[in-house]
């Protein structure tokens, strides 16, 4: 992998020729079109092939992967145009290995709304171990608010990506609601109904994990919320489903504020199978469009 800093007057074709790569791939890796004008000082990622395979008639991605002793997904990751191409073409050149490419294992998780751009989803899934589908809300009686998750679940299955059922205290208006947290934590009848509904849904749809993303937990619900997570984890583990908890980024146990006072790192870590430490330096639907 190289980083090329653009000089005045350089084009994508010039840079591609310098490194011996295709202009199409250089453009794809940097999310550019070949017609884009480069700016002096702009940094471009350049991936240089080390092992290249020319496809023959009748070959498939699995057969080529077996020949080189690599996973089929490595072929797809190294040639991302394959996500939108159903069949290999005779005479195509595929990158099997890039120069300096690491084989160190890495597990990545990505959140996605049901309305995600399908091309973007297809380009991203080969790199993900988990796809967190955002999100299922619920009512004050413990009924789930359904989402159109089937297209994402099917796409995840194609790439062997595990799907994560994200549970949020979202009202039908689509916003976080502290009252829903209280009801789920304190009302045992509602809690039991909610857990039953989660179990039915994850089993019928083929989810691998449940992620509890509860925000704005009141201080008085702190321990009851932990017990809810503990009960949910016990039920899910019994059917082979793991449970994770998304945690707000606290810097001290007594940090004031509605985002933090109801979150007990130690107890929630003990109650769930894993935790996800969130950051708020991102763009999202109701905030700025990027990091700030």
Label each residue range with its predicted role.
Residues 30-48, 86-99:
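Short, structured interface segments
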Residues 11, 60, 71-130, 196, ...:
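Non-catalytic accessory regions flanking glycosidase/transglycosidase catalytic cores in CAZymes
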Residues 140-147, 223, 231-292:
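Substrate-binding surface in catalytic domains of secreted glycosidases
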Residues 107-109, 130-132, 162-166, 209-211, ...:
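Structural preference for beta-strand elements that scaffold enzyme active sites
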Residues 111-115, 136, 168-170, 215-217, ...:
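Active-site beta-loop-alpha junctions enriched in small/polar residues
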Residues 132, 193-224, 273-288:
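Active-site groove signature of glycoside hydrolases
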Residues 99-192:
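Glycan-recognition patch characteristic of GH18 chitinases/ENGases
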Residues 1-19, 42-69:
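Primarily a LysM-type cell-wall glycan-binding module
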């Amino acid at each position: 992998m190289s980083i090329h800093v653009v000089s005045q007057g350089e084009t994508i074709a010039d840079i591609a020729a310098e490194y011996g790569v295709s202009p199409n791939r250089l453009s794809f890796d940097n999310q550019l079109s070949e017609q884009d004008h480069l700016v002096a000082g702009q940094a471009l990622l350049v991936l240089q092939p080390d092992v290249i395979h020319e496809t023959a008639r009748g070959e498939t991605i699995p057969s080529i992967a077996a020949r080189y002793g690599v996973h089929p997904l490595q072929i797809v990751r190294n040639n991302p145009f394959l996500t939108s191409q159903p069949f290999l073409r005779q005479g195509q050149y595929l990158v099997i290995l890039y120069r300096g490419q690491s084989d160190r294992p890495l597990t990545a998780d990505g959140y996605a709304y049901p309305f995600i751009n399908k091309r973007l989803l297809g380009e991203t899934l080969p790199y993900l171990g988990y796809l967190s589908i955002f999100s299922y809300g619920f009512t004050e009686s413990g009924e789930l608010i359904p989402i159109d998750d089937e297209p994402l679940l099917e796409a995840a299955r194609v790439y062997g990506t595990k799907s994560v059922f994200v549970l949020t205290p979202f009202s039908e208006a689509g916003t976080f609601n502290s009252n829903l947290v209280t009801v789920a934590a304190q009302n045992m009848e509602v809690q039991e109904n909610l857990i039953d509904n989660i179990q039915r849904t994850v089993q019928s749809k083929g989810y691998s994990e449940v992620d509890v993303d509860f925000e704005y937990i009141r201080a008085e619900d702190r321990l009851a919320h932990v017990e809810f997570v503990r009960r949910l984890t016990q039920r899910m583990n019994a059917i082979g489903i793991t449970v994770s908890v998304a945690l707000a980024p606290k810097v001290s146990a007594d940090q004031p504020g509605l985002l933090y006072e109801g979150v007990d790192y130690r107890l929630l870590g003990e109650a769930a199978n894993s935790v996800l430490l969130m950051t708020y330096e991102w763009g999202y639907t109701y905030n700025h469009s990027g990091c700030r």
